[in-house]
């Protein structure tokens, strides 16, 4: 399933996850004081994307730690 809201070619592997990703993006942007959109800088947008990645990795690591115990 492709994300039709953006012009990238990233594919979402879990159906219905786009809404959760968008919510996380908005929450992080608010925390960082970033206004997302075409007029914001790539640095500001990138900081939000980087934080999303960090949080998703942290969540996955927590889940994996739970499975290995």
From Swiss-Prot:
Keywords associated with the record: DNA-binding, Sporulation
PANTHER family: SMALL, ACID-SOLUBLE SPORE PROTEIN A
Other facts: SASP are degraded in the first minutes of spore germination and provide amino acids for both new protein synthesis and metabolism.
Family the entry assigns: Belongs to the alpha/beta-type SASP family.
Provenance organism: Sporosarcina ureae
Pfam families for this protein: SASP
Site-annotated residues for Cleavage: 27-28
GO BP annotation list: DNA topological change; sporulation resulting in formation of a cellular spore
Lineage: Bacteria, Bacillati, Bacillota, Bacilli, Bacillales
InterPro entries named in the record: SASP_alpha/beta-type (IPR001448), SASP_alpha/beta-type_CS (IPR018126), SASP_DNA-binding (IPR050847), SASP_sf_alpha/beta (IPR038300)
Protein name, as recorded: Small, acid-soluble spore protein 1
GO-annotated molecular function: double-stranded DNA binding
Function of the protein: SASP are bound to spore DNA. They are double-stranded DNA-binding proteins that cause DNA to change to an a-like conformation. They protect the DNA backbone from chemical and enzymatic cleavage and are thus involved in dormant spore's high resistance to UV light.
């Amino acid at each position: 399933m492709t994300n039709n809201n953006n012009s990238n070619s990233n594919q979402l592997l879990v159906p219905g996850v786009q809404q959760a990703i968008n919510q996380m993006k908005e929450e992080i942007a608010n925390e960082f004081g970033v206004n997302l959109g075409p007029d914001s800088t790539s640095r500001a947008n990138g900081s939000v994307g980087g934080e999303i990645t960090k949080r998703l990795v942290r969540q996955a690591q927590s889940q994996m730690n739970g499975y290995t115990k």
